[in-house]
Amino acid sequence: GEGTMMYGIGVGADLRDAANNLVEVGQSGLGLGVRDYYVNDDEQTKKIRDAYKAYMKKLFQMVGNDEATAQKKMEAVMAIETRIAKASYSQVQLRDIDKNYHKMTYNQLVLDYPGIDWGNVFLASGFPAFKEICVGQPEPIHEVEKILAETSLDDLKTYAEIKVISGATSVLSDDFRAVSFELSKVMSGVQQDRPRWKRAVSTVSGVLGEAIGKIYVEKYFPESSKKRMLDLVHNLQTALSQRIDEATWMSAATKAQAKDKLENFIIKIGYPDKWKDYSGLQVDDSLSLYENMANISEFFTKDAIARKVNKPVDKTEWGMTPQTINAYYNPTTNEICFPAAILQPPFFDPTADDAMNYGGIGGVIGHEMSHGFDDQGSQFDKTGNQHNWWTAADKKHFESRTKILVDHFNKIELAGKKVNGQMTLGENIGDNGGLNIAFRALQNVMKTEKLGVKDGFTPEQRFFLAWARVWAGNARPEYLQYLMTVDVHSPNEARVNGALPMVDSWYKAFNIKKGDKLFVPKNKRAHIW
């Protein structure tokens, strides 16, 4: 099955023909998820590798292997995964769109990658015939060809075996769950597993997301909330348009293209207009959770293939459920999406004044808009196609300005590990732009609305305090190190103490002077959107 393969298969919008879907194949197959955990040699990474080996060995023993066999099997899997990892792209390399796009005919795939029996792979996965495919990362796929040729059949079976067991630990008995949790403890420092009811809710929400979303919306998301959010989004759009007009580093030609893209944003708020149809999904009470989840997984795979392979992109589809406390920008549809659940404190409070709400949800809206113009989004046009709309000079200006952010975040250290400024660049551009755009929108509001001092803070100060409150949190050092290895967002603390020193209006609001701890000279601040 698909979960046992050493690479990933999917279907998504063709980056250069965004109206249509394209079958994709790319790197995958790593139990620890990312390359760094196999190739780095710092203390924490070594601990994680040791815990992962212990985890696999224990799972092999639990399904009937004696200790010596379990040890041998674990070593075989580790050898295969280490080979895949060494050939895989790093988190930074995965951000380079051109290097991760290699479109070819299906026949070319068969010729270029003869070490994999593609006909059987796609047949077994339930795909109809298709003409074109995109290979995301050629090198790891070539490495898989070599592994398949050079590895004994027994070891290949062992690899598939651990993928099946490992993929099922969350839906088997508690002893399997406990083994999986031991690995989580080392990876993220978490000391206590979530209670079963929370895990059950997550499982159902993951499977029947929009069915739960419909109930959530009926209960918690009145039409008035949708209207309020739409007004906020329009105000932020106006503010970004003003800031584009005022940018001194862009030519008129590029500004016109940027504004055209901004005006063509598709805006999704609250919940989808058309709910997912789950009527074909069978849940059988006489079966175990494991069997039901296997059937459900098969249903969703078949459903996605039927709706997407050889079909145009469905622009009404949502990438998140209404009950998800998050938001996103999708470059291939040029859409910004704000699920119903983000419209609650600390992001949005109907009883709070505009200063707080613009610093909270306003910053988030501005953040998502800025993704349309970040290191990746800026490469896509208003129709969602990857296509350059910048003059060469403006592109250079943009890159020199974003480099300031890369260098600034590279210097930030948390839990003994440095933030990766290149990996987090897109999100840091999002925060930088989001703060500037939301602040500008608040200034527009204050031209007609009197917002006085509250609790001893000016409206401008409350705006930044609201942003800081959104990201307030407490994380164990192991979890911070984990995030800095896998997450394209900077850790929460850096999203405040790293982001604010780049924003001119913050200095004025709090009268920050040279000599203050977070002070950065004006010529070292990133002025982008």
Task: Enumerate the predicted regions with their spans.
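Intrinsically disordered, low-complexity linker/terminal regions across diverse proteins
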Residues: D112-G115, C134-P138, R194, K198-V201, ...
